[in-house]
């Protein structure tokens, strides 16, 4: 579901999008002073795929890292699409509530697995056509391989990426899952970029530079999808990391967080060096897409993403 403000804003951008879909659209150019700017479609998690595409075109963003929740069926509550990230906040849960949630999640995972293994690949080709008609380049498919994936499910994920016409999968994965994914990346010759968060206590998670290094050593088809907000909140310097590893960074997630594992914030209110990272991309001419990822809580996703894009423009002026 989406808010009234989002609905109103989509109505404004919907007419030109309708015309574009009917006539074909010129490629949307969202480069800012030579820096490639895209979006993680998770930013529009409250919108359907068609609504998200309309929003991207209306804002003027021409590259998309496609969140799997936008193409897979929503078998859970709003915001709980397959592959969705857990939401923060809420009342303390009882043990019974936690067990009920675990059972619901198990059922959801099984339903999603059945769908992944049976859905015609034409579904993904149709998604590809929608982006092409809107003039938006599909940059990557965000499918987070985890330890619950079967081998058939992993293989199918690469088939989905091929049907979408992308050569990159981004994944919030684990080191143990990455070992199983590596042979499939080699088989399909599709790059898998590991996305990190800020969990420093679990060595199986991607958070520390050492975790990324371990994955990079597994396959030449493994790379890094660096989330500068999470990386900084975990206590690491994204600028130094990008300079040292830019050759194996496929794309960035741009967001603002407070230091010392602090919360997501509206851009400019946290501690993440967003402007400095963008300036680095510009000055070094790194061809690394900087993808907006709107993750803090706001009332209107479309308006907030527009603010994020303007922040980028101002930072690169």
Describe the residue ranges of each PLM region:
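Residue-level recognition of beta-strand->loop/alpha-helix junctions
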Residues: 43, 67-68, 142, 196
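Active-site anion-binding loops
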Residues: 62, 69-74, 84-88, 118-128, ...
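A generic structural signal for short
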Residues: 40-41, 115-116, 145-146, 169-170, ...
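Conserved long hydrophobic alpha-helices within structured protein cores
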Residues: 57-72, 185-190, 194
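Active-site acidic/histidine proton-transfer and metal-coordination neighborhood
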Residues: 12, 16-17, 29-31, 51, ...
